[in-house]
Structures are given as structure tokens and as C-alpha cells.
């Protein structure tokens, strides 16, 4: 391949579709990469549809070789709220994909650095999305494991390129665990759940659809997210518009047997913790192949969502208010969810990425048969 690489900024909706399409082309037929839903990608990247653009700005770039072939893509993002909250001047890079050519990866990263520097930024960091609800990190371990729709998958050579590019260094790692659903709820969870119910008057709460939508409980779930995650790596508080978007996108579609709350009977049944799971769409999305729900893809997704045609469940979010962590509220969540997992015949649970320094969360898995099987990394560089 000729190393004459041109970087083209995306300025049209047609260009954005081309930007999105490149990922499908690069990973077509891959055994472990999972095609993302196209409408999710478009809604996230479209400034008119993503509420994060109230405090973010972005520019998307394509890399084109001398034969006019698209050979890479990258998004440059500035999250002004996160920068203000953490007192940083960071430009983020995300949606990074490229062929195995150092000239391409270098040109893409330079484009983001130049764009960020022109806007007063002094550090480049990524892969990151607009917010912490987007996919984060470069896959550096677990290339032989099926991915999920919630995390990045990339070829092993990405890591080689990033670490050979001048001055990029590790900023943060996330670990992911695969957990065998036990045939019986572990005694640790069962006994702790019984104890904290009687000692602290904490109880499992199963939501109704109305509670989560018009009743406002869905908003309370994400208010707990804001409180629980506020001190984690580069987290910024979700806005009301973002919360409404996530309630409509995820909570309204959830199987409520797989959503568990914990309420405090001594505080007027205040919601103090929650866990949200979804059946895994991994195999369904692999069958669809191109990320399109129409004309037939929707049926494959529906079979998973409504009839649980999968052996794996994705544990998307867990949140416990700080003052209830030492009271064991998480034991109530797991005791209930494990029961629901067995009922649906799930054999495996995929825990979403956890910071490697978050040993408190990781310690939960010691009571279950689990394996840390993937690792994602975020890099940073002064510019």
C-alpha cells in the first residue's frame, strides 16, 4: 500500500454514513467482533440526536489512500463539562479503526491532536466516547473472546500502533469478567441478603413499567448512577436530557425481571441501589452481520429480548449509594438477579468493564465461578 494518506473531515450525513460503514467493512465476517446496531451508531454520532452535544463538540475524520480507498477513521471529541469538572484540557479520540499501516494510524492520531490543539487542548486521550455511557478503551487482552455490543473490539495490531506512536502512555485499564451462573445462590449472598433485610430494613423492589417511566423511578436509577460513579475516572454527571434518553433507550425496553432495585424501608422506601441486565445480543448481532434491523434483523433481536434465545446475560449497570455499600445492598441485588438468571436458563453472565483499581467491585466475583477474560486500555499524550 502506498503510504500517501489523506485525512478528510466529515461534513455531511452521507460522509457520516461512510464513516460508520468502514467499521463493518473492516470486520466483516470476523469470528469475535460483534457488529453494532447502525441506528445506535447514527444516533450517537449525530449532533441533532445525541444530547451530549449540548456540552460536547466533535469532528470525524476518514483516512484515504492514494487509490481513493478508505483505510481508517477516527472521531475527535471535546467534552467541555468533563474538562471543567476534572480541570483538564483534553481532546478525546474514539471510533478508531484502521488497516494495519502505521502511516494510517499516525495520520489519524495527528488529525485529532491538531484539531484539539487548535481549540486550546493540551492533552489527547482515548479511545473514549462522548460520555462514560459510550464504549471506552482499546482491547489489549481477550482477542479470542466474543465481544458484546457494549464494548470495543479491535485487531491486536491496534495496540502495537498506539504503543509505538510517540509519547502515548497508559492512562487507565478496564477489566471484564465472565461469570458462570450458579445452580444455587451462593451462601454468602443468600445469608447476607437475609441479614441486611432484618438488620437494616432494606428490601428488593421489582419495578413496574409505569414506575420506571411516568413514575420517575427510571430517573432515580440514573441519579444513583451520578452519585455512585462521580469519583470514577473522568466521569461527568448525566444531564436531565441524557437521563431521559437512557430511560427511553434502555429502561423502557428492559425485561423487568432482569432489573432489580433495593429500597430502604426506614427512609420511606427510598431507592438506594439497582442492577440492570439484558439478555446478550451478541449471537443475534453476529447473525444479522450488518447492524441493520430491517428487513429481518429485528426478529433475531426480538427472540433474544422477549424469549431469551441466548445462554448469556449482560450485567450492564449496578449502582449503590455510597452510604449503603457497607450495608451489603449489592448482596440483595445479586441474590435476586441470580434467581432470575436461573429461571431464564442463562448459563453465563458478562460483567461490563470495571476499572482495574476498583477492587471493591471486583471482590464481588470471588463468591462466584468467574474469569477475568478481557482488558481495555485508555492512552494519553501531552500535545
Where are the regions a protein language model picked out?
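Generic start-of-chain signal for non-secretory N-termini
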Residues: 1-32
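Short beta-strand segments
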Residues: 125, 178, 261, 276, ...
Amino acid at each position: 500500500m502506498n503510504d500517501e494518506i489523506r485525512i478528510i473531515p466529515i461534513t455531511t450525513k452521507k460522509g457520516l454514513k461512510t464513516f460508520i460503514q468502514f467499521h463493518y467493512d473492516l470486520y466483516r465476517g470476523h469470528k469475535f467482533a460483534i457488529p453494532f446496531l447502525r441506528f445506535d451508531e447514527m444516533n450517537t454520532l449525530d449532533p441533532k440526536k445525541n444530547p451530549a452535544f449540548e456540552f460536547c463538540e466533535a469532528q470525524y475524520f476518514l483516512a484515504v489512500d492514494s487509490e481513493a480507498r478508505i483505510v481508517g477513521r477516527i472521531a475527535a471529541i471535546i467534552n467541555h463539562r468533563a474538562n471543567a469538572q476534572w480541570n483538564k484540557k483534553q481532546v478525546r479520540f474514539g471510533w478508531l479503526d484502521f488497516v494495519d499501516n502505521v502511516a494510517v494510524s499516525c495520520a489519524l492520531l495527528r488529525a485529532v491532536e491538531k484539531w484539539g490543539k487548535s481549540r486550546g487542548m493540551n492533552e489527547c486521550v482515548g479511545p473514549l466516547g462522548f460520555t462514560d455511557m459510550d464504549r471506552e478503551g482499546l482491547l489489549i487482552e481477550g482477542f479470542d473472546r466474543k465481544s458484546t455490543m457494549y464494548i470495543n473490539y479491535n485487531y491486536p495490531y491496534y495496540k502495537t500502533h498506539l504503543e509505538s506512536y510517540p509519547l502515548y502512555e497508559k492512562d487507565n485499564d478496564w477489566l471484564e469478567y465472565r461469570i458462570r451462573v450458579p445452580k444455587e445462590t451462593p451462601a454468602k449472598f443468600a445469608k447476607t441478603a437475609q441479614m441486611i433485610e432484618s438488620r437494616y430494613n432494606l428490601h428488593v423492589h421489582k419495578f413496574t413499567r409505569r414506575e420506571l417511566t411516568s413514575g420517575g423511578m427510571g430517573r432515580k436509577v440514573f441519579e444513583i448512577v451520578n452519585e455512585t460513579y462521580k469519583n470514577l475516572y473522568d466521569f461527568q454527571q448525566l444531564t436531565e436530557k441524557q437521563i431521559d434518553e437512557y430511560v427511553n433507550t434502555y429502561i423502557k425496553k428492559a425485561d423487568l425481571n432482569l432489573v432489580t432495585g433495593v429500597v430502604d424501608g426506614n427512609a420511606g422506601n427510598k431507592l438506594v441501589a439497582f442492577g440492570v441486565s439484558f439478555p446478550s445480543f451478541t449471537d443475534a448481532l453476529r447473525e444479522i452481520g450488518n447492524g441493520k434491523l430491517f428487513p429481518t434483523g429485528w426478529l433475531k433481536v426480538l427472540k433474544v429480548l422477549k424469549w431469551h434465545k441466548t445462554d448469556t446475560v449482560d450485567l450492564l449497570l449496578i449502582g449503590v449509594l455510597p452510604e449503603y455499600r457497607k450495608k451489603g445492598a449489592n448482596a440483595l441485588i445479586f441474590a435476586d438477579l441470580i434467581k432470575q438468571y436461573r429461571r431464564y436458563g442463562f448459563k453465563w453472565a458478562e460483567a461490563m468493564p470495571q476499572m482495574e483499581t476498583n477492587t471493591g467491585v471486583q471482590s464481588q466475583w470471588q463468591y462466584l465461578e468467574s474469569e477475568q477474560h478481557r482488558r481495555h486500555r485508555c492512552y494519553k499524550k501531552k500535545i
